[in-house]
């Protein structure tokens, strides 16, 4: 502890060594041996393309990529937001007047700008060379006539986020000075770091915006970890008997992906091995990345846990058994770029397809079948619901059904079967287990489509071996109420 600042030593692997240095320092003098002052600048963020809007909406609000795309599309259809499916983060050079008018309108429309002294410089967001098919996402002037409070909260969040980003991008850079002071004490070296803000710039607007959020998102960037207003250290400055403490730190594994980090990884995938002049790089396009993530979730290869995306056992197994060429981000990125070139008439579609066909033949020849070890990766580890009435195999619960694990058997009971939906009854694993064990299940509060009333009764399994399983509902053994053929 040095005049309110903290100086830290490099990592020490052994606790006894750290304790010995602490004891020595408490009886010694800490002397400042060097002070380095560096002026740094944090440039304003770029405007949103679809992927960056999806990342930020996930980080701040927890929205999935698909939710953000749907919300942006809804705002576009209401003429409140520009076309969302874009990969550009700039406006065209001829949009200067539009951008200036929009920024001025936003200053009076967005609550967090009330009382702010701000003169937007939209020249920073104009560059026709950086615009492909569609320019960056910004609110339209129709917002001036709209009632923000009347919009659904989720749409209002996205519209405000896009408007805030335009104002951030048109603001001054954030500048600050980083001070790095090195101390010697009892033979050990300690480093203190801090910063002094020189100009808040766009971060003042960001601070105002963040203050309006119900839940504060995590901050990123090295400057956020630095102590503000570092003491004015000078070389030769000394501190007698400084306060010293030992802190223990655990290494942490890499964090699981969120949609924000996965979208960023998809955008950058294969970039280091791809031609820097390629028009399209990364996995997917801004318009397709949300659908790719949703398909992984629906297919059971990834599951959502809060904001995190966790690979399932099947997902890990699939990656393990696929040939490396099929899991290469570089290959997919090259295909994406070639498809873009084909769309522009700059590449041969027939030649591209011949290459795909040749690769498919080579893969089939090289990997004619899957090994027993790899097959074992996909063995069912789900609890058995019951025995199949057709073949005696084990029946498991899927996301949408209860199915026989015997691949040669077609027995399946669908959770959304019309029989249960008409009776407003959830087809639970408990009901499924009873049907498989006894051919019947006691169910309370079955709804009668004929009378509009509910009753307690029996659901009977009436499987005839066809494509679909049939059911009957009865109140008693001798009075059948309904039947589905």
Task: Provide a role label for each language-model segment.
Residues 1-74, 78-80:
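Conserved phosphate-chemistry cores used by DNA topoisomerases
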Residues 18, 36, 65-66, 84-485:
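Basic, low-complexity terminal or inter-domain segments flanking catalytic cores
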């Amino acid at each position: 502890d040095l005049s309110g600042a903290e100086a830290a030593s490099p990592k020490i692997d052994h606790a006894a060594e750290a304790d010995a240095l602490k004891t020595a320092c408490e009886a010694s003098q800490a002397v400042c041996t060097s002070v380095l002052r560096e002026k740094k600048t944090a440039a304003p963020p770029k405007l949103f393309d679809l992927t960056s809007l999806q990342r930020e909406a996930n980080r701040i609000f927890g929205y999935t990529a698909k939710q953000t795309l749907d919300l942006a599309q809804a705002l576009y259809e209401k003429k409140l937001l520009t076309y969302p499916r874009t990969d550009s983060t700039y406006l065209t050079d001829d949009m200067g007047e539009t951008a200036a008018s929009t920024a001025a309108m936003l200053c009076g429309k967005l609550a967090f700008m009330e009382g702010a002294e701000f003169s937007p410089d939209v020249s920073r967001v104009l560059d026709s060379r950086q615009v492909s098919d569609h320019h960056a996402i910004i609110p339209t002037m129709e917002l001036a006539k709209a009632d923000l409070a009347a919009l659904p909260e989720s749409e209002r969040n996205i519209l405000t986020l896009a408007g805030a980003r335009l104002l951030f991008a048109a603001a001054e850079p954030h500048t600050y000075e980083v001070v790095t002071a090195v101390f010697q004490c009892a033979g050990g070296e300690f480093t203190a770091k801090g910063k002094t803000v020189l100009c808040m710039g766009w971060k003042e607007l960001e601070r105002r915006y963040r203050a309006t959020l119900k839940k504060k998102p995590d901050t990123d960037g090295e400057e956020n970890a630095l102590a503000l207003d570092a003491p004015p250290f000078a070389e030769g400055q000394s501190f007698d008997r400084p306060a010293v403490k030992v802190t223990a730190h655990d290494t942490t594994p890499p964090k699981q992906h969120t949609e924000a980090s996965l979208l960023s990884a998809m955008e950058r995938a294969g970039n280091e091995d791809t031609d820097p002049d390629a028009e399209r790089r990364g996995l997917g396009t801004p318009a397709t990345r949300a659908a790719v993530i949703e398909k992984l979730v629906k297919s059971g290869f990834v599951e959502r846990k809060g904001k995190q995306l966790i690979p399932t056992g099947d997902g890990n197994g699939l990656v393990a058994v696929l040939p490396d060429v099929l899991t290469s981000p570089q290959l997919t990125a090259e295909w994406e770029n070639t498809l873009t070139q084909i769309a522009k008439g700059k590449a041969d579609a027939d030649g591209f397809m011949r290459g795909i066909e040749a690769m498919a033949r080579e893969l089939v020849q090289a990997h004619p079948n899957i090994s027993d070890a790899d097959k074992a990766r996909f063995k069912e580890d789900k609890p058995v619901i019951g025995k199949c009435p057709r073949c005696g195999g084990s029946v498991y619960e899927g996301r949408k059904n209860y199915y026989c694990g015997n691949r040669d058997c077609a027995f399946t009971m669908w959770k959304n079967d019309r029989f249960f939906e008409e009776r407003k009854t959830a087809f639970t694993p408990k009901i499924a287990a009873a049907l498989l064990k006894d051919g019947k299940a006691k169910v309370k509060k079955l709804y009668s489509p004929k009378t509009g009333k509910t009753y307690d009764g029996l659901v009977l399994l009436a499987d005839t071996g066809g494509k679909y399983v049939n059911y009957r509902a009865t109140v008693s053994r001798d009075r059948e109420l309904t039947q589905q053929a």
